[in-house]
Amino acid sequence: MSKGFTLEKNLPHQKAGVDAVMNVFVSATPHLTDNVAVRLLANPELKLSEQQYYNNIKNVQAFNGIAHSKDNHNAKSNIIDVSMETGTGKTYTYIKTIFDLNKSFGINKFIIIVPTLSIKAGTVNFLKSDALKEHFRDDYKRELRTYVVESQKNAGKNTKSYMPQAIHDFVEASNFNKKYIHVLVINSGMINSKSLTDTYDTGLLDNQFNTPVDALRAVKPFIIIDEPHRFPTGKKTWENIEKFNAQYIIRYGATFSEGYKNLVYRLTAVDAFNDDLVKGIDAYIEDIVGDGNANLKFVKSDGKEATFELNENNNKKSFKLAKGESLSKTHSAIHDLTLDALNKSTAVLSNGIELKIGSSINPYSYDQTLADNMMRKAVKEHFKLEKELLTQRPRIKPLTLFFIDDIEGYRDGNDISGSLKTKFEEYVLAEANELLKTEQDAFYKNYLEKTVTNISSVHGGYFSKDNSDKDDKIEQEINEILHDKELLLSLDNPRRFIFSKWTLREGWDNPNVFQICKLRSSGSTTSKLQEVGRGLRLPVNEYMCRVKDRNFTLKYYVDFTEKDFVDSLVKEVNESSFKERVPSKFTQELKEQIMAQYPELSSRALMNELFNDEIIDDNDNFKDSDAYSRLKSKYPAAFPIGVKPGKIKKATDGKRRTKMRVGKFSELKELWDLINQKAVIEYKINSESEFLSIFKSFMLEETERFTKSGVHTRIDKIYIHNDMAMSKSIVSDDDDFAKLNTMSYREFLDNLSQTIFVKHGTLHKVFCDIKDTINITEYLNIQTIRKIKSGFSKYLLNNSFNKFSLGYNLISGSIHPTKFTNADGNPLGEVLSSDLGVLQDNAKAPLDTYLFEEVFYDSELERRNITDREIQSVVVFSKIPKNSIKIPVAGGYTYSPDFAYVVKTAEGDYLNFIIETKNVDSKDSLRLEEKRKIEHAQALFNQISQSVKVEFRTQFANDDIYQLIKSALP
């Protein structure tokens, strides 16, 4: 199990957000303050003329396709806005921006402002994590030093008052030591605290400042605001933020409720869903059948009593309730709901809902049966998903989050019949025991046994009142939920169900939340996107690596009062989009996009039309600013608006399926059974010495990949130039490097051996043989192990069939069920259309010999194969579904071809073809890894051909499938 998340570098959507901010400061120059006492403690001031600032923002907006309008731009404001949808990594994006601002301009002090304690906890954990430190260390040679402002106990009357320690340390931290970037984290509650404006007995910055806010202002901070919609301008918190007099305020969020100041980058919800940067969403809506149309309205109040009117089946009744009374008095369906607070205009219920006079609730949404059904369904679906994800390799541990308002029923429900906790544990035990009857997977069986043995260990909760609770068990639960994601996701930890009121509704998230169940409506105006955001991130596997090679879905459970949840969410997603980027040139990608939807157009005809309509010029550039808009109007089917169908749907919508022409399957069956045989790759390395030679070659060729473990001194010299203090760095030579290993040689060998499955003795011998070139004892760290693993896997792939040969061993045994067949080997009537392709051509029918009734494809080349030019000799052909056939290749990778053809020759013989489509001009255009994978496929089908002949061919962009098959016929 990994001890930290594996962070990915240079993800395009995150890099674009960083670049957008950095390009705002093109031509900016840093200047140190004249105040000698502050000079080494404050940020340099970035000097940028108003005109340059304006031009930079205009250029960045143009590059990112953002309209340069008054809605997106205010040249007088020092606020820069970055809009990124929930779950796409905005925290990582602003942290990388911090590193880049430091690297480019020496900005060394940042204040991160967050709205809530839960968000603060998550942010601080990430900032202090070893994974983050290691991730940025190579590129920047810097580390973050994090200071957290916490609430203080009041000092006694005769006690000397001291400034908050975090602020003191942050302000007084010297920039002379360039190793550290200083980051102060503070939540909105502390921003408004007196502790920031009080005068203290001890001052800062050579006793020039006795109040924290003045001292913070003096260091000329850069401020980063997380969740800007929680900091409305004109309110007290924003006014206090402005007192810091930041050089620039950079706001990161998915929601900007008051609009933008200077919007430089936006990753919309549409982008996030369409580009598979987040999970899709299935909503499970619990409907009431029968008497569900009841309405309980809050009609009036004198401040002491509230009057409610029940309207059910056209019968009206009035009820008066005082503070503390249960609403079960008004309707038998209501449970665990009381009137908590009351004035003349507002009634506050115990679940946090505020009712204004005239507003109402549906009593049946508080019915215990409804809540029980939702909880039972969520538990059942969790175990179905868990069985799938924990019996695969690598494993993924799913979590389920419950939002409840019956806190007592959860916290105090032990051994109380009918309590929320008791019922939940009964549901879990029932599902776990049922699975144990048949489970064969050893790991998952043990996991289920631990569940049954200690049922209380599978769940935990976090509620706002827990912050004052001293119970050790509760503290452990909170620590896992708020502070230690890795521990919560550990396969050794059976906890996978989390309960909260609404405390975790915003800011908190965990990538492995696959289900969110709202047992009670929150009554909140929080956006639907914010609510689902707790589970939108793509999951990580047991090694803490993000899993991106398949589509995942977040299941969201709501009751019938939110029956329009999906419609509202889709509307919100699409309304959150903004003007798309306008390209300057008609690209090959745009051409393929249009031709995919208008297959009757040839490439030449399309280009002629665009030229004649004066949309493009001789060089394929768009002729004017309206040309792209005219292009979209001319070919609307190629430019769909909004989120793709199916990315957000009701669970009852079902997945799109396409019908198989079952009668044709018998002709394909022999080939289908052949290619579905399991195969094991065999490295034909004949001796230990031969493997030693290969691994040694890799190590010698990849020396530059490794980073030494140790301390390297860099000397920063301060000098005077034009009456201004400046600094320059002098990099010391290698003699100044002090080795500092993070693990022993033995630990390194153990870890590396387990990671790449090579014997200790082999590794030790190689390291001894190459010690004159690279002394591995200088590189004893986890980063070296990771680089050896990834590098050696790629090295094996790239050098297969070159430095060593390969073979395949076919494994006999049952292959069914498959993507095309059931457990008995009989053909399925239909398959998931997404397994055949993400694009659909409704304009053309597939060829008669095609296995399916509809055309689903992934590239124009595939579409042509399916719809164009019937080949007389072809008996049947089919797209090979995604992930149905995984050919093992060297280095632990897999490979999947695209088409299967059965051909009948003039002599009456049957020939089998497997086709790989590559939408490039020739083999020369392929990357080395792709070439090697194709060679692996060729080797496998050569092996299969010893019993039944199977021809493997690669089809390039200009290859006609007819000619390709014809050339292989005898």
From Swiss-Prot:
Q: Where is the signal peptide?
A: none
GO molecular function: any one?
A: type III site-specific deoxyribonuclease activity
Q: Does the keyword ATP-binding apply?
A: yes
Would the keyword Kinase turn up in this protein's UniProt record? no
Q: Where is this region: Endonuclease domain?
A: 894-918
Q: Where in this protein does the record put region Helicase-like domain?
A: 75-540
The EC number(s) attached to this protein equal: 3.1.21.5
Provide the alphabetized UniProt keywords: ATP-binding, DNA-binding, Endonuclease, Helicase, Hydrolase, Nuclease, Nucleotide-binding, Plasmid, Restriction system, S-adenosyl-L-methionine
Q: Which reaction does it catalyse?
A: Endonucleolytic cleavage of DNA to give specific double-stranded fragments with terminal 5'-phosphates
Example GO BP: DNA restriction-modification system
A Pfam family this chain is assigned to? ResIII
Top EC class for this record: hydrolase
Q: Which Gene3D superfamilies match?
A: P-loop containing nucleotide triphosphate hydrolases (3.40.50.300)
Q: Which residues bind AMP?
A: 91, 122, 126, 226
Its required cofactor(s), as named, are: Mg(2+); S-adenosyl-L-methionine
Q: How does it assemble?
A: A heterotetramer with stoichiometry Res(2)Mod(2). A heterotrimer with stoichiometry Res(1)Mod(2).
Q: Which family does it belong to?
A: Belongs to the type III restriction-modification system Res protein family.
The record's NCBIfam families line, in alphabetical order, gives: PRK15483.1
Q: Relay the domain remarks.
A: Has a helicase-type domain in its N-terminus and an endonuclease-type domain in its C-terminus. AMP lies in a cleft in the helicase domain.
Q: What is this protein called?
A: Type III restriction-modification enzyme EcoP15I Res subunit
